[in-house]
Amino acid sequence: MQSFAKITAQGTYVPEKVMDNNDFEKIVETSDEWIQQRTGIIERRIADENEYTSDLSYKAVLDLQEKYQVDLTDVDMIINTTLTPDYKTPSVASYVQAQLGLKNAGAIDINAACAGFTYGLNLANGLITSGQNKKILVIGSETLSKITDYNDRSTCILFGDGAGAFLVEYDKEEMSFIASNAGSDGLKGHNLYCTELSEEMFSDDLENHGYIVQNGRGVYKWAVGNVPNIIHEVLNQSNYSIEDLNWFVPHSANARMIESICEKANIETDKALKSLKYYGNTSSATIPLSIDLAIKEGKIKKDDLILLVGFGGGLAYASTLIRWTI
């Protein structure tokens, strides 16, 4: 018997505290106009001092449960994608498992930075279609504010906190996942990093220990040069073309970057769904937050063909072409 994986519910959570562009004028030399022109960001959400990634993950799942009235007692795997876990161990996924009371569910964290959520979805699809699991929560959650240097103008204006969750289930007939790909360019990892135990990479010294460091130009050049090829590669696996897409959901890193990717890939810019305007760059949470905003705006409908492409730190990428089944 063939097994299909189907997305059946989605939820999100963002912290209450809002930090808008005007707030940054008091911290670093910048302005609302400068930030909007270069990034497309107006505001972002910031977690409280005692609010951590696991809290955001759990609240996103509660939102999913409340909106769709789904039974989560038989969830058998939790995949949490994050680069800002509460602890080195145990995992954020284990915390969510405990909070939900799912005694026998597997739990794993994935650190693929901004590509994390699409990696998580692809893993969930593989686990379900192989017959190993039946019901999986995939969560992308970040508290990037806790690893942001607010003296560094080039990065502090970009990042925010948030979480999004999808429920992926076994189905006999209907499937969400059509095609996918993934890869990385580790030699360019120095363009976006946050140090932990080591302070060097390929014998090069790294800076600003414990905070995000980004070579914006390097990341931009890599993304615009590679993401269009990634898009065409995953579409070539399917029977669909660029014109067939209802929506394109890239990682919401920067509005200019997304426009350049769309132009090079021949995707209409109004098909690109983004979350950065109100949430900033939330790394692994940007894609589920973008989906949620589009649903609330009445854009996404059942059976829409949607291409999700995550890319960023690593430099890593993962994409998945889905049919919206909610």
From Swiss-Prot:
GO terms for molecular function: 3-oxoacyl-[acyl-carrier-protein] synthase activity; beta-ketoacyl-acyl-carrier-protein synthase III activity. Residues 252-256 are annotated as: ACP-binding. GO terms for cellular component: cytoplasm. It is an enzyme of class 2 (transferase). NCBIfam families: fabH, PRK09352.1. The last Arg residue of the ACP-binding site is essential for the weak association between ACP/AcpP and FabH. This is Beta-ketoacyl-[acyl-carrier-protein] synthase III 2. It comes from Staphylococcus epidermidis (strain ATCC 12228 / FDA PCI 1200). The gene is fabH2.
